[in-house]
């Protein structure tokens, strides 16, 4: 038996090589891997000695040789293949263990294009693909996590086809991922990220019980190991819908730096939000906005879930808590609650990935765009359009309202008072309806809107929403502006003595 080992990631390769040697494998290797194995006492033959052909062009050509690919690709059950192999002195290679040049790591560490180009692996993917194609005769490995499993299987002497099949699938996933990253990088560097093709590649984290509905299948996939590093289940398992709501809640609660922010989300939209002097007070005020919708919702905590906050949350049923951190006493509070799910990022404050791009599936394809972010200076650069300026406290509330609006389904309007959301209308086909629905809900909750501020994610097309806001005592408004009737909106604000600011940036969310 013969194995070819050629790896960039040397983790576990010595132990793996020794086990193969003990099992009677002749080991071939290249360059740095050959040297590393030899230094660690493993009997190994360099590929150039095996092929009788030297490495060429500063190592660019090492394994691209008929004796390598013929040794991998010929079918052991095909008499014609066996005959050709003998005639051409091609020896079988029964196991291929390859992982690839660190292209992605190089692009992160360096902007030198020559260096980046040299870290595009050619021979490695070719060997992986060859071995995967002939998976019935050749075992292919590209992940150090599989070394132990393969050795155990080899020792048992019973290598079923399903085991080989899974290694084959993993190999093609690996090379596809590698090539996709290269293509995306080149398009990012030379075509602004929008080339003729776009590859979206994620790694599975786990299967969900089902998708959005019980008859659908679902799973969570991640970019750059984000969830593996920043999402730990402490109680319960996340469903598909939990994950989308967690995403919405986390995005909002994490948008205020280190502030003790609490966001409550239901079906992707905020039904509560507050920033008060501490997290307990933030939760109390966030819940007031719509305690009915908060039932069974998702609570995001920009800080630590402690015992006091846990006791307060435990007064009603919430389905999910996502917190930057969770202490043991807080977990104990929920021991008797079977249905609640608790997740943490094990950090001081909530963490976002800040993915640069966003996409949505549409029938027959997908639409792809730069991610929408509320700019750091977006509110600071907002232009005062009215005669009246907002007070210092109103400005704080306006910024909160503006950010909530940016994370809420269009059309929306958001009312904030003293650091807490007091009313919200979202997902409406007209902005005036959103304004009216928000006010009606606030009245139902017994909330006083007098002195609050108002934000909208897009411009007001008419003055009607301003007229409506005046009836409940709105003192200041922030919106993008850009309507052909902006002058009417400004006039209405001045009539009611409101402060009005235009940011110049729209935040539609569909």
Swiss-Prot record:
Alphabetical list of Gene3D superfamilies matching this protein: 3.40.140.20, Methylglyoxal synthase-like domain (3.40.50.1380)
* Keyword Transferase among record annotations: yes
Q: Name one GO molecular function term.
A: phosphoribosylaminoimidazolecarboxamide formyltransferase activity
- Gene Ontology cellular component list: cytosol
| SUPFAM superfamilies per UniProt | Cytidine deaminase-like, Methylglyoxal synthase-like
| Catalysed transformations (reactions) | (6R)-10-formyltetrahydrofolate + 5-amino-1-(5-phospho-beta-D-ribosyl)imidazole-4-carboxamide = 5-formamido-1-(5-phospho-D-ribosyl)imidazole-4-carboxamide + (6S)-5,6,7,8-tetrahydrofolate; IMP + H2O = 5-formamido-1-(5-phospho-D-ribosyl)imidazole-4-carboxamide
InterPro entries for this protein:
AICAR_Tfase_dup_dom_sf, Cytidine_deaminase-like, MGS-like_dom, MGS-like_dom_sf, PurH-like
Q: In which pathway does it act?
A: Purine metabolism; IMP biosynthesis via de novo pathway; 5-formamido-1-(5-phospho-D-ribosyl)imidazole-4-carboxamide from 5-amino-1-(5-phospho-D-ribosyl)imidazole-4-carboxamide (10-formyl THF route): step 1/1; Purine metabolism; IMP biosynthesis via de novo pathway; IMP from 5-formamido-1-(5-phospho-D-ribosyl)imidazole-4-carboxamide: step 1/1
GO annotation (BP), single: 'de novo' IMP biosynthetic process
A Pfam family hit? MGS
Q: What is its EC number?
A: 2.1.2.3, 3.5.4.10
Segments forming domain MGS-like: 1-142
Q: What keyword terms does UniProt attach to this protein? A: Hydrolase, Multifunctional enzyme, Purine biosynthesis, Transferase
Domain of life from the UniProt record: Bacteria
Q: Which PROSITE patterns match?
A: MGS
Which HAMAP family does this chain map to?
Answer: PurH (MF_00139)
Domain remarks in the Swiss-Prot or TrEMBL record: The IMP cyclohydrolase activity resides in the N-terminal region.
The molecule here is called: Bifunctional purine biosynthesis protein PurH
| Organism, scientific name | Campylobacter jejuni (strain RM1221)
